[in-house]
């Protein structure tokens, strides 16, 4: 059966959310929505009970080529030329669940200040560093405060609402090769894969793995490929040096923190209080 995205009229005529949406996700997810598509701004949605499909007025049915949950978001790709890609953001505001439906265009329109990224120093950013990390990054150039404590995965992380939102495992090129051969990196990446965002940063070049003196040529690159296929959501970044490894880690964690924070913001032109009562 081909998965379908359905837009229908909400049979509750007095509802402030006049549309019903069906997402072909798992057993099927129904939402009430403010509009039938996020054309110019993000659209507020709210969970809905499964309706009697035979009795509702269906506006359109479109085959979905992809409907995938990725952390707090659901990415929807429809099998048509226009109005093809959109995303549902599941978050909360003041303890109440809220859902935003957006396209790349409507997301940019809602937050125009984010269209052109600018280099800036994060003054109040706090990174968590694993207490077992020795000779770690200081991020001194970026005004970052470090909080030492035991991390269940990775060497550095950022926290949102008491939970780790992203983490980075740091490896020198020698430690990376050793952990590949003894299998410990496999377990580390399995733990990282359980987080919303994670990566492994290597202070060295990929080409140096081809010259490893204690293994046959190609053995370690083969292990890298196998791990990357096994854990595709945990990228392995070869940052060339310690300096660039620190720089990449800072930017990755800052972006992860900014992204998670942005997901908690209300729709432009509508307060979150208004959104949570529009159901």
Whereabouts are the PLM-identified features?
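Extended, alpha-helix-rich binding/interface surfaces that flank or overlap catalytic cores
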Residues: 1-40, 47-137, 145-279
């Amino acid at each position: 059966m081909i998965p379908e995205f359905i837009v229908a009229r909400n049979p509750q005529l007095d509802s402030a959310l006049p549309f019903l949406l069906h997402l072909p996700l798992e057993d099927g997810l129904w939402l009430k929505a403010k509009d039938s598509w996020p054309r110019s701004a993000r659209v507020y949605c709210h969970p809905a009970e499964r309706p009697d499909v035979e009795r509702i007025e269906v506006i359109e049915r479109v085959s979905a080529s992809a409907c995938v949950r990725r952390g707090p978001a659901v990415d929807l790709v429809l099998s048509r030329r226009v109005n093809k890609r959109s995303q549902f953001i599941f978050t909360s505001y003041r303890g109440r669940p809220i859902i935003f439906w957006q396209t790349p265009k409507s997301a940019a329109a809602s937050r125009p200040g984010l269209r052109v990224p600018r280099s800036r120093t994060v003054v109040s950013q706090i990174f968590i560093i694993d207490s077992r990390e020795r000779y770690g990054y200081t991020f001194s150039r970026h005004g970052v405060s470090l909080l030492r404590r035991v991390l269940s995965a990775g060497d550095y992380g950022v926290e949102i609402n008491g939970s780790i939102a992203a983490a980075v495992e740091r490896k020198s090129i020698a430690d990376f090769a050793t952990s590949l051969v003894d299998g410990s990196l496999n377990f580390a990446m399995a733990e990282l894969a359980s987080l919303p965002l994670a990566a492994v940063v290597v202070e060295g070049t990929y080409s140096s793995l081809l010259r490893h003196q204690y293994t046959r040529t190609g053995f370690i690159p083969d292990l890298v490929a196998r791990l990357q296929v096994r854990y595709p959501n945990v990228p392995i970044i070869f940052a060339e040096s310690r300096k660039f490894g620190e720089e990449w880690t800072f930017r990755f964690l800052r972006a992860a923190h900014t992204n998670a924070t942005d997901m908690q913001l209300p729709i432009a032109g509508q307060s979150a209080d208004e959104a949570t009562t529009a159901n």
